[in-house]
């Protein structure tokens, strides 16, 4: 494994490159061809909301010198993994109760496996991509690539000293393309970087690295700038239906195709700016980073799913769902979505939690993450209003005498707890003085 990462261009050999059609990968592909490698270009169709013409990307790769260029449709698999993440609650990062839906890690899990599988079909066993050494993606792609092809070698132009010396910046790469006859005009550089797929968009870096720079500099690509009072956003009533843990209908319209359902959920949530969040997170290498995230469809489905979870399952099941979801979210973030420990947690949630989730949730969406749940319907609900009704109920499930007995049984653990607190007070762990949290503890 020590020779897995190649620090110099493998001349005369096939090199697969994850090709986006942007400046970096265009310049890298042309440079590799000129330096003697045989580049093969692979483009993932992940339903990116900011991509207009996927079919044009492989043609562009061929023009830059690719031996062959393929467009790999990853949307169905991405939809499948996105729904699995919702079923498991695989989201470990949140601020103020608003989660980051791990949309980039989900995209990397799909891209890293499906592109390398396509390379294997072409007998391409060297892979390059645009991830940098400071980020998470370099490790995610490394893991998923080697899981898919254990014989894979990794070559990244951005880790090659010669490439960096010759084409180390955007200006140098643009001039390189122009000098080689390509009419390349650099786009106006934004104040931040954006990466997206069908499930969500990530905005980070540059100006957003400063915590004093707020979300308002971001131009949403999956919805509206809900903070702008000039943007008219009308309240909207929406229904979301699940069957056996799978979202199947929106506003009464059934979808046989998960991709189409997610795209419609994006449109609905996007009209309100639902699912946008500002997060500080810990990267895989433990350094903190900051990102602004969009995920309107994931947010809509997650809200409805969790409402059904709380109405159907008991407290202990919900607790395990949440704890395991945090663990699984972190594994997903680290590029371990297909590791045994992740598969174990996924199977647990999908079998014992998701299978019972059948029903319809009605919501009113307003601006941003402001919403109201209007109704929750399910044949599997264990919520029954009459069980705890404050009104007099015929044939009540329990009466005052029953509760007296239940409370009397609590005397055992209350007595044990008081004894333990007394021990803690005697040893100095707790103070029994007047202003203490437990001022009366020392009294008999």
Curated annotation (Swiss-Prot):
Pfam families, A to Z:
Arginosuc_syn_C, Arginosuc_synth
Please report the name of this protein according to its UniProt entry.
Answer: Argininosuccinate synthase
Cellular compartments per GO CC: cytoplasm
Q: Which family does it belong to?
A: Belongs to the argininosuccinate synthase family. Type 2 subfamily.
Complex formation: Homotetramer.
Primary location recorded for the protein, binned into one broad class: cytoplasm
Give the enzyme class: ligase
Q: Which GO terms describe its biological process?
A: argininosuccinate metabolic process; L-arginine biosynthetic process; urea cycle
MF (Gene Ontology): argininosuccinate synthase activity; ATP binding; protein homodimerization activity
């Amino acid at each position: 494994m020590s020779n897995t990462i190649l620090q110099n261009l493998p001349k005369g050999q096939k090199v697969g490159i994850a090709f986006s059609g942007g400046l970096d990968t265009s310049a890298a592909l042309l440079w590799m061809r000129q330096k003697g490698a045989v580049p093969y270009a692979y483009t993932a169709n992940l339903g990116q909301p900011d991509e207009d013409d996927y079919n044009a990307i492989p043609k562009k790769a061929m023009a830059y010198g690719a031996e062959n260029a393929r467009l790999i449709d990853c949307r169905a698999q991405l939809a499948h993994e996105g729904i699995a993440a919702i079923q498991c609650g695989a989201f470990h990062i949140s601020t103020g109760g608003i989660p980051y839906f791990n949309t980039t890690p989900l995209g990397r899990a799909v891209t890293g496996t499906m592109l390398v599988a396509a390379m294997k079909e072409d007998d391409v066993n060297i892979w390059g991509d645009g991830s940098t050494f400071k980020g998470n993606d370099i490790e995610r792609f490394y893991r998923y690539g080697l899981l898919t092809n254990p014989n894979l070698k990794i070559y990244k132009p951005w880790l090659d000293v010669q490439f960096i010396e010759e084409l180390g910046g955007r200006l140098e790469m643009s001039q390189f393309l122009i000098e080689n006859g390509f009419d390349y005009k650099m786009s106006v550089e934004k104040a931040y970087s954006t990466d997206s797929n069908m499930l969500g968009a990530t905005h980070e870096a540059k100006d957003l690295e400063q915590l004093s720079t707020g979300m308002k500099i971001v131009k949403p690509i999956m919805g509206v700038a809900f903070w702008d009072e000039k943007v008219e956003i009308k309240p909207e009533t929406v229904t979301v239906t699940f069957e056996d843990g799978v979202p199947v209908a929106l506003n009464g319209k059934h979808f046989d195709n998960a991709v189409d359902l997610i795209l419609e959920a994006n449109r609905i949530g996007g009209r309100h700016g639902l699912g946008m969040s500002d997060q500080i997170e810990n990267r895989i290498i433990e350094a903190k980073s900051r990102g602004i995230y969009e995920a309107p469809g994931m947010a809509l489905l997650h809200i409805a799913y969790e409402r059904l979870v709380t109405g159907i399952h008991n407290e202990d099941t919900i607790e395990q769902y949440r704890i395991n979801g945090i663990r699984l979210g972190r594994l997903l973030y680290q590029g371990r979505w297909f590791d045994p420990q992740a598969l174990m947690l996924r199977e647990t949630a999908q079998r014992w939690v998701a299978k019972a989730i059948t029903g319809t949730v009605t919501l009113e969406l307003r601006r941003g993450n402001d919403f109201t749940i209007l109704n929750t319907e399910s044949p599997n609900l264990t919520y029954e209003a009459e069980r705890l009704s404050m009104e007099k109920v015929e044939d009540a499930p329990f009466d005052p005498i029953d509760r007296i007995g239940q409370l009397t049984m609590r005397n055992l653990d209350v007595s044990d707890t008081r004894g333990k607190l007394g021990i803690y007070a005697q040893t100095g762990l707790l103070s029994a003085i007047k202003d203490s949290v437990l001022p009366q503890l020392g009294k008999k």
